[in-house]
């Protein structure tokens, strides 16, 4: 009876060791693969955004500029990180806008003229979160991306009130990580954020799952090998 109890305890210990080894290995496998897929998703996000903007290439644009409209050159080692001020005149009047340093540096366009162009184009045909997310998802599907994506589009109007729109599927939003954020427009009034969600079961490949199962089985085999050697 005592011998059977000792064997059971030893079996449980071997099983726990195997499970712990599988969990630790699985964690590092998951983190490694997640990092890889995040890089892929981030690069493809900008590709999707470019493709979405190309849909508006047929819009006729009439812009009038005067004076010095050139924005300061982005310096990523600038320790001051001071905001910049831009002036605009539209049908709503004249106004100076203060752009935070982070928004200025994360605008996808460096040219001030191109930024003004995007402001006008997206005023005429606003960015759609669903449309962008669909393009992003379709491009990611080509590389067999194992996660889920969500897009948020934030727009700050002339009176500096911000509104947010999300792509349809929000079931994973609370579990998702903010992967990439960028801005468009002369005053960086349009913010686009891409979210990703990864289930560990989907991220790990069949080979990874077999490896984790093998670790548990191997720990149990140690118990039976020991029993065999004793006998």
Which positions does each model-derived feature cover?
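Juxtamembrane interface at the cytosolic side of transmembrane helices
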Residues: 2-10, 202-231
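A hydrophobic membrane-anchoring alpha-helix module
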Residues: 185-188, 201, 205
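Extreme N-terminal signal-anchor transmembrane helix of membrane signaling/transducer proteins, especially
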Residues: 7-26
């Amino acid at each position: 009876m005592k011998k059977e109890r000792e064997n059971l305890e030893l079996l449980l210990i071997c099983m726990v060791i195997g499970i712990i080894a599988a969990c630790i290995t699985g964690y590092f496998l998951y983190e490694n693969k997640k990092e890889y897929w995040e890089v892929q998703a981030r690069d493809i996000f900008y590709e999707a955004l470019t493709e979405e903007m190309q849909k508006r290439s047929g819009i006729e644009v009439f812009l009038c500029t005067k004076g010095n409209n050139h924005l300061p050159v982005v310096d990523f080692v600038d320790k001051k990180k001071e905001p910049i001020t831009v002036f605009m005149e539209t049908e709503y009047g004249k106004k100076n806008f203060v752009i935070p340093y982070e928004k200025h540096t994360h605008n996808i366009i460096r040219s001030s003229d191109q930024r003004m162009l995007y402001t006008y184009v997206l005023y005429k045909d606003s960015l759609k979160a669903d449309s962008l997310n669909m393009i992003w998802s379709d491009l990611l599907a080509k590389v067999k991306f194992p996660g889920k994506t969500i897009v948020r589009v934030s727009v700050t109007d002339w009176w500096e009130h911000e509104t947010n729109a999300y792509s349809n599927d929000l079931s994973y939003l609370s579990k998702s990580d903010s992967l990439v954020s960028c801005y468009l427009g002369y005053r960086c009034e349009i913010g686009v954020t891409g979210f990703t969600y990864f289930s560990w079961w989907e991220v790990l490949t069949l080979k990874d799952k077999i490896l984790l199962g093998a670790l548990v089985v191997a720990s149990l085999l140690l118990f039976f090998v020991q029993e065999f050697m004793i006998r």
